[in-house]
């Protein structure tokens, strides 16, 4: 690869130094500053996901052929660098959210809000809006609870109940919240063609298929 081409590639995939500098100050930022930084991190992540989508590749797609050679249909170097940056920014975002929760709890304590730990977590989740998708819908069974909730194939999942990008634990927590809320509506936040959509999904066995949702969810 020519030096000029490499420099252009690096410019397209590197994290803005000013963003990196602000990330390093997460533990000293005020809550308002963290919310601005959260938006900027999410914007950068969306840009990276867009590049991967343009190449028709995800975070876990193979970059080599069955014979062990680099794929010729994707920019392997670019994808590798973007994946590395995405993982770094996801970790930074989790750190930011954890710090935000600490500051929110301190704020509520200072106001002498008397609530139990579960109620406080709910307040935290309402105060911080998660907009980064962490999974996508690869299949929806007709007539299923997911179908009735107007969930479509290729929709990206931002949150279901109180499960979001920062706490889904490899999608395991989705199963837990779904089982806990059988026959009770769950708020769902989706990303569809660049638009954030809200819907209500009621997990149920009262349909002709298997499972409580009738859809297949895969991690991004």
From Swiss-Prot:
Protein name: Probable 26S proteasome regulatory subunit p27
Keywords for this protein: Chaperone
InterPro entries cross-referenced by the UniProt entry: Nas2_N, PDZ, PDZ_sf, PSMD9
PDZ domain ranges (all copies): 119-196
Source superkingdom: Eukaryota
Other observations noted: Present with 846 molecules/cell in log phase SD medium.
Family stated for the protein in its record: Belongs to the proteasome subunit p27 family.
